[in-house]
Amino acid sequence: MIVTILAVILGSMILHELAHGLVAYGLGDTTAKDEGRLSLNPFKHLDPITSVLIPLLMYFTGGPIFGGAKPVPINTRRLKGGAWGMALVGIAGPLTNFLLALVAFLIGHFTGVIYGADIAGTIVMYVVSINLGFFIFNILPIPPLDGSRVLYAIAPDGVREVMEKIERGFGIWLVFGLILIFSSALSSLMINATNGILQFFLMLVGAQ
C-alpha cells in the first residue's frame, strides 16, 4: 500500500505544480515553460524534503499525510497583476488539490466504492485525504507556502517586508522546523479541517 500512497502523493504534487506554472503562463510569465517545468515528469518536480521526507515522516508517525514539491520558478517582473497575480499563481496549486479531492470523492460516492471495504475504495479515499492534506497544508499563510502568496497581496508593506526576510533567511526549513515543534497541534488542525471538508462533501451529495 505504501507504493500506492507514494504514487498518489507524486501525482497530486505534479498536478499542483503544473497548476502554478500554467496560471503563471496565462498571466504572461513563461519562466516555468522555458525551464521545462510544465511537464508531467515527476523528477522535474521532486524536492527531497517536502516531496519525500515530510510525507514519509507523517505517514510513519500516524499523522495526516501532506507535503509539497519543488516550487515552480516564477518571474514576478513578467507576471501581470503584481501581488494579486502572484496570489492567483499561489492559490492555483492548493485549489487543484481541493478539486482533485472533490472529484475523487464524487466518483467514489456515485460508484459506491468509498462505502465498501475493497481496495478500490481505499485508493479513492487515499486520493481524497492526501489531496485535502495538501490543500490544507499549502494554504497555511507561512512563507514560503502557497497561502503566504495571498497574504503578500493583502498585507501592509511592513508585514510583507518581514515575510520576505523570513522567506529569504529560512525558506522551507522554517516550515520543517514548525512541523517538528508543533507536530501534535498541526496534526490536530489537519485532521479537524479534513473531517470538516469531508462533512461538506457529504452534505453536497445529500449523504449528511
Which residues does each predicted region cover?
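Hydrophobic transmembrane alpha-helices and their immediate loop junctions
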Residues: 1-208
